[in-house]
Amino acid sequence: MASPFFFVFLLSALSLENTYASPNYREALSKSLLFFQGQRSGRLPSDQQLSWRSSSGLSDGSSAHVDLTGGYYDAGDNVKFNFPMAFTTTMLSWSSLEYGKKMGPELQNSRVAIRWATDYLLKCARATPGKLYVGVGDPNGDHKCWERPEDMDTPRTVYSVSPSNPGSDVAAETAAALAASSMVFRKVDPKYSRLLLATAKKVMQFAIQYRGAYSNSLSSSVCPFYCSYSGYKDELLWGAAWLHRATNDPYYTNFIKSLGGGDQPDIFSWDNKYAGAYVLLSRRAVLNKDNNFELYKQAAENFMCKILPNSPSSSTKYTKGGLMYKLPQSNLQYVTSITFLLTTYAKYMKSTKQTFNCGNSLIVPNALINLSKRQVDYVLGVNPMKMSYMVGFSSNFPKRIHHRGSSLPSRAVRSNSLGCNGGFQSFRTQNPNPNILTGAIVGGPNQNDEYPDQRDDYTRSEPATYINAAFVGPLAYFAASRSP
């Protein structure tokens, strides 16, 4: 008879056997990818579906005599920050690699979203030898204005890192994005895939050879917006892990070993990549029985134990409504990223029929899946507010999101420029945004499950590319496994 102190972790409160109807995950998946069209910078194609957006940033890079058009605006502003953009690209690519077979026609839409970013990241990496461009736009000037990206007249300052002003973090994240995406395109566009991988190797070598945090090199241009708070070791591990998966080159195995263990976080985000790297590297230990990566398998499981609510080592708070609550500012970014890791590690466990322990609790794959599903469902409307935090999904969703293009009249409605200050009248109104940024996931409710839906409350009402990117994988998983 089993010890009374040893029990199977069932997460009964979060069981899949629930009393509510599951959301339409397939619809949410489609809309989560459509969102990226609303964030596009550059010349828009003829098949642009969010028609209220127009081409913008067509001279980006000109101040440095290079072409840096394209890519994505990170959130509700008109700045291109490559650090979170590259993470967005890596997570979209990981979603496609792990769940592509479950995505149906959305796999091609995912590739389109990825390529919009990688075309730009390639420009940033290849435009000037010995230099990596890492952003366009003056965030301090941009944030003082409320204007459409099509009209922006704030400085389009170009930022870069180099051997004398290093940025191992942003370089390694860029390498991760290029390496991960190279696998996405390996069969459908081999030539493009080879270019991505070759560039990833060069950028990763740059990150390794010239050590330093980009926050120190660029200071107020990236801080406090996207400071590298966790340092750059996590990105070196993350980047090397992706190069290893893309190449299987022993060089990256040895480099990963040289880095040793890392922090034991209870978070995963555009800044802190440790948990993501652990899960990615654990894949080799779980699926291939590769002892070189057993350390990271243990680290991945320690991370899961910090997330599961009834685990003895849990350090994660949950709202009364069941939502993970990590930090007040844009909490859903952590929810979607962690949910991706839960779903993906459970996938690895299921394929090999593995379990692990959190103290005396035996963790089975469905414990992770049940928690993942609860988070996905909460975001999609199964919550105390009965509100979907994905714009345009269901009838009750955020109507006043903190997003310049969405909140201002489109060019079709008002062709003349509003100027830097002309848009603040729209910013201050209680009217719903005139343009629906379909699929955007906002920062989310507070710790009391409350969401005021106020445009000036950017910590809760601002969407961001990295919130959506991590959500694509879990949506694809549940869309494919949902019972009719």
UniProtKB/Swiss-Prot annotation:
It catalyses: Endohydrolysis of (1->4)-beta-D-glucosidic linkages in cellulose, lichenin and cereal beta-D-glucans. Residues 1-21 form the signal peptide. GO terms for biological process: cell wall organization; cellulose catabolic process. It comes from the Eukaryota. It is found in: Secreted. The active site is at residues 77, 402, 453, 462. Glycans are attached at residue 370. Its EC number is 3.2.1.4. Pfam families: Glyco_hydro_9. Induction: Down-regulated by auxin (IAA) and abscisic acid (ABA). Specifically expressed in root cap cells. GO terms for cellular component: extracellular region; Golgi apparatus; plant-type cell wall. GO terms for molecular function: cellulase activity. May be involved in the sloughing (cell-cell separation) of the root cap cells from root tip. Belongs to the glycosyl hydrolase 9 (cellulase E) family. The sloughing of root-cap cells from the root tip is a process of cell-cell separation that entails cell wall break down. It is important in plant development because it assists the growing root in penetrating the soil. This is Endoglucanase 3. It comes from Arabidopsis thaliana (Mouse-ear cress). The lineage of its organism: Eukaryota, Viridiplantae, Streptophyta, Embryophyta, Tracheophyta. The gene is CEL5.
